[in-house]
Swiss-Prot record:
Keyword Cell inner membrane: no
InterPro entries assigned to the protein according to its UniProt record, in alphabetical order: Aerobactin_biosyn_IucA/IucC_N, IucA/IucC-like_C, LucA/IucC-like
GO MF entries: acid-amino acid ligase activity
Listed pathway(s): Siderophore biosynthesis; rhizobactin biosynthesis
Native species: Rhizobium meliloti (strain 1021)
Protein family per UniProt: Belongs to the IucA/IucC family.
Name of this chain's protein: Rhizobactin siderophore biosynthesis protein RhbC
Gene Ontology biological process terms, A to Z: rhizobactin 1021 biosynthetic process; siderophore biosynthetic process
Keyword annotations: Plasmid
Gene3D superfamilies: 1.10.510.40, 6.10.250.3370
Record bears the keyword Coiled coil: no
């Protein structure tokens, strides 16, 4: 059962990519009240067809069985694993794409096997993960299938199966940190004014374990650096690190302390009794990139921390309550000859979910929306339960839920951009939503790496906050910043929420899109005098990241200029289509 469900989920996310990125090869056929998805391969590669249980205007479709593959050998029924291979091998058949196909086949295979193992390991938890009350760490470790429009959302390129089980959140993992003593001349650290230093935070969390680690060290001035255990093993093979260890300038102290728990990003680690989280460097290929903290990204935590303390944010929050920023105000790493050693840098994030708040009913948005076979989504369960308790129709409760989501997400996220030019890559894994009595009441944004602003806004921001965004290289042209905000916050999170509500059968997407359109026009009237972002959200097409094409091109979305990190393309905008429907109603 778990193998079948994992293959079904993998095929679904792959076909969602295909429908979005290769629309000229896709047809939706309706016969006798049944909808069918048909994919025609180029260069006489045949076709693949299967039932479509739900077609979403936002791209979050649901598919059924059987799957039929037709080519020169005739038509035959294939299972989901065979269908995945056929799609990858036949969709881009050119010689130039061969390496990309091989890489994608391997990653998709890896992702599917991890989902299968996670479904098996967490089978007894799946119902509770869709319950009314879910803690931060439970939700973080309960995102089983991941990104619904990505060909390999759970690949862990570089990790063995045993390592994945030990270090991945899907297996409810927890493990102690690996520690290195670093000669203080090499140790590089910083923190925002007003924030605890990295050393202060570590001492608070580790207590006597710090003293035990330092006791056997040789005479000299050393600082302690926590490293992800998997990353530590890899870095010891690095010639620069190996030389420092051989010279006694870095000392491997082994694992020590209480277990830390990986969150949905795999590399960010949480402890319910610590006042901070650790965003580790992790040289593992996850979705579209290897997750290593870059020097400029360490400084973006200071940008967010300073902005959050400033009157600009305080005044904005009074106008748009509901959004909390979670900065990473401290960092540490190893610096030699003036350059950070990639792979050893650690960013330290404030932890609002500690102590009495560890059991707070909060969840990353992706886990709320995730639809699993035989279970559906937590979103659907919450709304069905509220409709039952309130004795109101499902569609009315779903609209109320979405209205509250518009208030706490769309207004502050896009309002901040319209007023101050600050964009956040607020996709569904970077947003944590707080639930009370079944409804969303507040949001937390994390991930300083995706916190930047455009050049036109820079003058006013730097006047209020000298140097803002400059050392962190967080100032970009308005066009690429618009593009990132449109994809991560609008397409991924907002339209993703529309699709999640629609595919649960709770309410029509057309009704939700009409609500969204009204909200965007209202926001534009209030804040949008100097920006065209709302017009772009209402345009006939949207600039959208193409995860399948990005993977076929073997691009790393965290490497290179912002403008060239991923493949982007134009997709049909469901909001524009809704406007046409309403205009002719």
């Amino acid at each position: 059962m778990h193998a079948h469900n994992a293959a079904t989920l993998t095929l679904r996310s792959l076909l969602n990519c295909v429908a979005r990125e290769f629309p000229d090869h896709v047809r939706w056929l309706e016969t006798q009240g049944h909808l069918r998805f048909m994919l025609t391969f180029p260069e006489g590669g045949g076709s693949l067809g299967l039932p479509a249980h739900y077609r979403s205007a936002t791209g979050h479709h649901l598919f059924g069985e059987p799957v039929m593959l037709t080519d020169e050998n005739g038509a035959k029924t294939v299972d989901a694993v065979e269908a995945i291979s056929a799609v990858i091998e036949r969709l881009e058949p050119s010689i130039a794409a061969k390496d990309g196909r091989v890489d994608l086949l391997n990653r998709t295979h890896s992702s599917r096997l991890l989902i299968e193992a996670a479904l098996h390991a967490r089978n007894g938890d799946l119902a509770a993960l869709a319950g009314d009350e879910v803690s931060f760490v439970a939700a973080e470790q309960g995102l089983i299938a991941g990104h619904g429009i990505h060909p390999c959302p759970k690949s862990r390129e570089g990790m063995t199966e045993a390592e994945s089980r030990r270090y991945s959140p899907e297996f409810a993992a927890g493990f102690p940190l690996r520690w290195f003593a670093v000669e203080s001349e090499l140790f590089h650290t910083g923190h925002s004014q007003g924030s605890p230093s990295a050393e202060e935070w570590l001492k608070e969390a580790m207590g006597s374990d710090i003293d035990a680690l330092k006791a056997p060290l040789p005479a000299g001035d050393f600082s302690l650096l926590p490293v992800h255990p998997w990353q530590a093993d890899q870095m010891l093979k690095d010639p620069t690190v190996a030389a420092l260890v051989a010279a006694g300038r870095m000392i491997d102290c082994g694992e020590a302390g209480k277990p830390w728990f990986p969150t949905s990003s795999v590399r960010t680690l949480y402890r319910p009794d610590a006042s901070f989280m650790l965003k580790m460097s992790l040289g593992v290929g996850i979705t579209n990139s290897v997750r290593v903290n870059l020097a400029r990204e360490l400084l973006r935590g200071d940008d967010m921390y300073r902005f959050r303390r400033h009157e600009l944010w305080q005044d904005f929050s009074r106008s748009y309550p509901g959004l909390t920023l979670i900065p990473d105000p401290a960092f540490m790493g190893v610096k030699i000859d003036g350059a950070l050693i990639d792979g050893l840098s650690v960013s330290m994030r404030e932890n609002p979910f500690t102590g009495a708040n560890a059991d707070r009913n909060v969840s990353l948005l992706a886990a709320v929306c995730e639809h699993l076979p035989d279970r559906g989504s937590r979103l659907g369960a919450l709304i069905r339960n509220r409709a039952h308790l309130e004795r109101r129709p499902l569609d009315i409760v779903a609209r109320d839920w979405f209205e509250r989501f518009l208030t706490i997400f769309v207004r502050p996220i896009f309002g901040l951009y319209l007023r101050h030019g600050i964009a956040m890559e607020a996709h569904q894994q970077n947003i944590v939503v707080e639930i009370e009595h079944g409804y969303p009441i507040g949001l937390f944004y994390r991930d300083n790496q995706g916190f930047f602003h455009h050049e036109r806004a820079h003058g006013a921001l730097v006047e209020a906050l000298p140097g803002f965004g400059e050392p962190s290289e967080s100032v970009f042209g308005e066009e690429p910043v618009d593009e990132r905000l449109l994809y991560y916050a609008f397409i991924n999170s907002v339209l993703g929420m529309v699709g999640a509500l629609g595919r649960e059968g709770l309410v029509s997407e057309t009704a939700l899109l009409a609500m969204l359109r009204r909200e965007l026009l209202r926001l534009e009237a209030l804040e949008g005098a100097n920006s065209g972002i709302v017009r772009k959200m209402l345009a006939p097409t949207l600039q959208c990241k193409a995860n399948l094409k990005t993977r076929l091109a073997r691009m790393d979305e965290l490497v290179g200029p912002l403008e060239t990190q991923s493949v982007y393309l134009q997709i049909t905008n469901p909001l524009f289509e809704t406007e046409k429907v309403l205009a002719h109603a």
